[in-house]
Amino acid sequence: MSKRDFYEVLGVSRDASERDIKKAYKRLAMKFHPDRNQGDETAPEKFKEVKVAYEILTDAQKRAAYDQYGHAAFEQGGMGGGGGFGGGQGDFGDIFGDVFGDIFGGGRRGGQQRAQRGSDLRYNMELTLEEAVRGCEKDIEIPTLAACEPCDGTGAKKGTSSTTCSTCHGQGQVQMRQGFFAVQQACPTCHGKGKIIKDPCNSCHGDGRVQKTKTLNVKIPSGVDTGDRIRLSGEGEAGEHGAPAGDLYVQVHVKEHNIFDRDGNNLYCEVPVSFTMAALGGEVEVPTLDGRVSLKVPLETQTGRMFRMRGKGVKGVRTHSAGDLIVKLIVETPVKLTKRQRELLKEFQESFDGKDAKKHNPKSEGFLSGVKNFFDDLTK
């Protein structure tokens, strides 16, 4: 099968600079990387083709040979001898890691494989507002992978140990060559571990870990809110064959409260008052998380008026300064009136009639005046 021109593969001209070649490689490597194209069987081959073109065209000596002899310079028996450029090329993952850093979690470095760290775990915890504000302790049960006790997490039967894999010599990877392609992959003998367990533990069957449900006591600091996350270091799944354990992340969700709404460190609540208290003034009891307090209601208070009670909110988990309680007064209209009460209200209403009526109901008069002007403008 004929091979594509390397310049065509990268989409650059034959006089392209090394910078242009590297830029094209980054774009195409991200486009065709197998991790981003799972299920696309053509992606790995396209990625390898891009990588080979990059390796050749960024090496001055190899590029000169390619410009003069084309693909023949790197074929068996061609320029450069058997094996072509294979002896001088780097790891498939190394070059990708050098160019992209940790975009895909870091390059696949060569060298001895280490046992993998345990996975992190997540637990969703629901709290009442009072628990979140004051702090509390909760016992939780977590299904996890724990280190096997009989073998101390090694995977080998007690009194025995693992041996270095003879296929990869402990590297965990082997290099496969296809023509001028050289690709590293997990060792098929040890499955990338670098070690072989000849006499596995009967409890964990060589894995070094067993399924277990463990109980933890979680201390919730005061002031947490929905979306906060508490990290418990080392309480995730056990690592492979003695590697460090992962972490446990407790995700906090605060349930809705029947009185208070929370916004940051401030609390909000609505308090109903009678229309007589709103008109004449007085005192009303207001609930707080620390008990009841009195709020003075000024004369002629309108419904919806808000009052700020400083320091009666939530003490923040990070700031340690308390927010405020914002109280919204709602003026209630009396219901189920007696005949006498209706008569009194009628007399009260009639007392507003006359030339002074406007001053008693400034909002109503302002609204009616606005409506009149609106319709007057429509008829002009």
From Swiss-Prot:
GO terms for biological process: chaperone cofactor-dependent protein refolding; DNA replication; protein refolding; response to heat. It is found in: Cytoplasm. Signal peptide: none annotated. Zn(2+) 1 binds at C148, C151, C201, C204. Its main location: cytoplasm. Its cofactor is Zn(2+). Keywords: Chaperone, Cytoplasm, DNA replication, Metal-binding, Repeat, Stress response, Zinc, Zinc-finger. GO terms for molecular function: ATP binding; heat shock protein binding; unfolded protein binding; zinc ion binding. GO terms for cellular component: cytoplasm. Binds 2 Zn(2+) ions per monomer. SMART domains: DnaJ. A zinc finger (CR-type) spans 135-213. Residues 5-70 form the J domain. It comes from the Bacteria. It holds the Pfam family DnaJ_C. CXXCXGXG motif repeats lie at residues 148-155, 165-172, 187-194, 201-208. Zn(2+) 2 binds at C165, C168, C187, C190. Belongs to the DnaJ family. Homodimer. The J domain is necessary and sufficient to stimulate DnaK ATPase activity. Zinc center 1 plays an important role in the autonomous, DnaK-independent chaperone activity of DnaJ. Zinc center 2 is essential for interaction with DnaK and for DnaJ activity. Participates actively in the response to hyperosmotic and heat shock by preventing the aggregation of stress-denatured proteins and by disaggregating proteins, also in an autonomous, DnaK-independent fashion. Unfolded proteins bind initially to DnaJ; upon interaction with the DnaJ-bound protein, DnaK hydrolyzes its bound ATP, resulting in the formation of a stable complex. GrpE releases ADP from DnaK; ATP binding to DnaK triggers the release of the substrate protein, thus completing the reaction cycle. NCBIfam families: DnaJ_bact (TIGR02349), PRK10767.1 (NF008035). This is Chaperone protein DnaJ. The gene is dnaJ.
